[in-house]
Amino acid sequence: MTIESCPGGRVGEDGITNPSNIRVLVVGVGIGGLAAAIECHRKGHSVILVDKIAQVDPLAGDGIGIGTNGARIIAKWGGGRVHDQILSHRCDTRKIEILNRQGESFGQHELKGYGRDHGYMLNRGQLVSILFDYAGTLGIDKRLGSPVTEYRETEMGAAVVLEGGEVIEADCVICSDGVHGAGRKFVTSLDPVSRESGWAMSRAYLRKEDLKPHRDRDVRILDGTDKQDRMMVWFDHGIQVSMWTVKHGEELVWIVTHKVSVDLSLLPPPTLGTKDARDTWTMEGSESMIEDTISQIHDWPSRNMIEPILRSTPPKRLLNQKIITREPLDRWVSPHGRMIIIGDAAHPYPPISGQGGSQAIEDAAVVAIALQLAGKDHVPLALRIAEKIRSVTSHYLMLQGHHMLKSTGSHPRATAIQTEASHLYELMFKPDWGVVAKNPSILAPPCPKWLFQHDSQAYVYAEFGKIAEAMADGREYVIANTPPSA
C-alpha cells in the first residue's frame, strides 16, 4: 500500500490533500488534540473537534518547550505562517546558565533543539491559542463547551455522546483528553496506575509589570533581555529552580522542583467522575503556597536573585503539581480499532523529559498519515499501525523518568527517554560541584539526535507498507526508530 494508491494521496495547495472521506472526531483542544485536528484536515479527512472547556485562555499554564522534532511538523502549517507566529512569542535565548545555591555561575551552555528554526519555548496557553486560531482558519468544526459523557464503538465506526444527549458519529475517534480522560478508560479498561516520586513542581507564568513592586530587588534575570531572553537554572541538593524570560523580558516563567510538602491525607477523596486529588493533584495557587515555595530556598545565599520573582507572582498564575510516574500502556487502540488515545492520555511523561508537547504532535501527525495511507476501508489498520510506530517512543520516554520505576515494557524508544531523564534527576538533585567545576557540560540539557532529529512523518511514509504487510502475514515487525541503547 503506497501513498499514490490511497484515496487522499494527491497533495494540493499548502500541503492539504484531496478529501479522503474519512470522518474523524477529535476529543481535546490541548496541543495533541489541536495538532491531530490540523494534521487530519491537511491529510484530507473531515474533522470535528470537541472539548468540555468553554474557551481557550492564552494566559493559561506556565511554559512549554517544543523541540525540533515537534516544530518541524508545525513549520509546514500555513506555509510557515504558524511557525513564524509562534516565534514572535518565544523565548529566544540560545544559552542556559547553570548556578549553585550561592549564585555562582558554572557557565552558559547551548540550548540545543529550541533555537530559531529548530524549536520554541513559550507560554503553554499562548501556544494552544495560536493552534486553536489556526484550526479556525482551516474551517475545522470546533465545538467548545461540549463534554463527552459516553464513548461507543462498533466494527463499522465510533461515536461519542455529548452532555445533553447529542450523538456524533465518525469513522474513528482520536482521544487527546488527558490521563484521566474517559477516552483512556474506554480504550484500555484500566484506571491510571501511578507511582509516587516524592517530588512536586511549583510553576508559574507572570508578566514584567507584575515585578514593579519589587524592582528595588536584584532581578538579575532581566539583565540584557531587551536584546535577548535569558534562562537561568539553580541546582542544589533536593531542589532545582528554573527561570526564563519570554518576548525579550516582557514575560517570565519559573519552575521550582522540590520535595512534596503537602500532606496528601488532607486532600479530599474524589467524587464520582473526578480524578483523585491524592493521586495526581494540581493545586491552584495561593499566597500561602507562594510563601511555602519561597521557604524552599530560605537559606540560599542567592535567594535575593529568585525571591522577587516568586513573590511577584499573581497567585492565580501559580500551580503546584505532584510529579508521578506511570507504567506504559500495552494498548492505545480500542478493541474494534476505531478509537486511539494520544498525548498524555497514552503517555504522560515526567516533566524533565521536556517532550510531552512534541510527542503529542508526533502522535497526531502519525495518526493522520496512517489514515491517509490506509484509506476509509482500513481505518482499524491505520490506527494499529500508528500505535505500533508511536508506542515505541512513548514507552522509552515514560520509563526514563525515575530510577524507581522498573518496567519491562516492550517499546524501547519510549523506554530510553525515561532512562535518560532519571540520570538527569540524579545530576540535578545530587550535584557534585567539584565534578561540575571540572566538567560543567554534564549539567547541560541533552539533545539526542535520535529524538530531536527524528522525522516522524517521513518515517510513516517509508515504513507504513512494510508494517501493513507484516501484520497481514502475521509476522512481527521490528520498529527501526529506536534509540541507540534500545
Swiss-Prot record:
Gene name per UniProt: pboD
GO biological process: biosynthetic process
Cofactor or coenzyme needed: FAD
Residues that, per the record, bind FAD: 51, 65, 124, 344, 357
Purpose: Flavin-dependent monooxygenase; part of the gene cluster that mediates the biosynthesis of protubonine B, a hydroxylated and diacetylated cyclo-L-Trp-L-Leu derivative. PboD is also able to accept other cyclodipeptides (CDPs) as substrates, including cyclo-L-Trp-L-Trp, cyclo-L-Trp-L-Tyr, cyclo-L-Trp-L-Phe, cyclo-L-Trp-L-Met, cyclo-L-Trp-L-Ala, cyclo-L-Trp-L-Pro and cyclo-L-Trp-Gly.
Pathway: Secondary metabolite biosynthesis
GO MF entries: FAD binding; monooxygenase activity
Record carries keyword Chaperone: no
UniProt-listed Pfam families: FAD_binding_2 (PF00890), FAD_binding_3 (PF01494)
Residues annotated as catalytic: 203
Phenotypic consequence of gene deletion: Blocks the production of protubonine B and leads to the accumulation of cyclo-L-Trp-L-Le.
InterPro entries recorded: FAD-bd (IPR002938), FAD-dep_Monooxygenase_BioMet (IPR050493), FAD-dep_OxRdtase_2_FAD-bd (IPR003953), FAD/NAD-bd_sf (IPR036188)
PANTHER family with a match to the protein in the record: MONOOXYGENASE, MONOOXYGENASE, PUTATIVE (AFU_ORTHOLOGUE AFUA_6G12060)-RELATED
Family, per entry: Belongs to the paxM FAD-dependent monooxygenase family.
Listed Gene3D superfamilies: FAD/NAD(P)-binding domain
Record keywords, A-Z: FAD, Flavoprotein, Monooxygenase, NAD, NADP, Oxidoreductase
Keyword Transmembrane helix part of the UniProt annotation: no
EC number(s) stated in the UniProt entry for this protein: 1.14.13.-
Root EC class: oxidoreductase
Superkingdom as given in the UniProt entry: Eukaryota
Name of the protein in question: Flavin-dependent monooxygenase pboD
